[in-house]
């Protein structure tokens, strides 16, 4: 029989880090609220969630790298939340490209989840932060719980 491994969505005893971009805060605060809702619903204690605010999505990868190297903080998973909305310049491409590097700085010790929404308009961002298209912060947090359990199972 083929062995199958799958992480469960049970967060009891897990410690999570959420790194949140302050830029487009009206969107990222909704994403953070969604993440906190997911943690609560899946058994992660509020005291086991550490939120780190960074200026923008561009700063997410370097902050992930710093958290992973920290001796002070140890987490079951890290979630990165941000909102990059296309404007009239090429800045969108630069920032969204840099934000997407969060996975490349991960060292494999804990899951690093990309919860940054990249949209063409403010309306799309609002939809993905909890109105029509669900809440991507909630989805990122449940993915983090599941992946933390999977990493633990893999050993």
Swiss-Prot record:
The residues listed in the UniProt record as binding 5-amino-6-(D-ribitylamino)uracil, with positions renumbered to this chain, are: 23, 57-59, 83-85, 114
Could you provide one GO biological process annotation from this protein's UniProt record? riboflavin biosynthetic process
What positions constitute the catalytic site?
91
The protein's Enzyme Commission number: 2.5.1.78
Q: Domain of life of the organism in this record?
A: Bacteria
Question: Molecular function terms in GO for this entry?
Answer: 6,7-dimethyl-8-ribityllumazine synthase activity
Provide the residue positions that the database annotates as binding (2S)-2-hydroxy-3-oxobutyl phosphate: 88-89, 128
The cross-references to InterPro entries, in alphabetical order and at most eight, read: LS, LS/RS, LS/RS_sf
Please give the catalytic activity noted in the UniProt record.
(2S)-2-hydroxy-3-oxobutyl phosphate + 5-amino-6-(D-ribitylamino)uracil = 6,7-dimethyl-8-(1-D-ribityl)lumazine + phosphate + 2 H2O + H(+)
Among CDD domains, the record links this protein to: Lumazine_synthase-I
Q: Which GO terms describe its cellular component?
A: cytosol; riboflavin synthase complex
Q: Which UniProt keywords apply?
A: Riboflavin biosynthesis, Transferase
Pathway stated in the Swiss-Prot or TrEMBL entry: Cofactor biosynthesis; riboflavin biosynthesis; riboflavin from 2-hydroxy-3-oxobutyl phosphate and 5-amino-6-(D-ribitylamino)uracil: step 1/2
Q: Which SUPFAM superfamilies match?
A: Lumazine synthase (SSF52121)
> Which HAMAP family is this protein grouped with?
Lumazine_synth (MF_00178)
The similarity annotation says: Belongs to the DMRL synthase family.
- State its role: Catalyzes the formation of 6,7-dimethyl-8-ribityllumazine by condensation of 5-amino-6-(D-ribitylamino)uracil with 3,4-dihydroxy-2-butanone 4-phosphate. This is the penultimate step in the biosynthesis of riboflavin.
**Name of this chain's protein:** 6,7-dimethyl-8-ribityllumazine synthase
Look up and give the organism this protein is from: Leptospira biflexa serovar Patoc (strain Patoc 1 / ATCC 23582 / Paris)
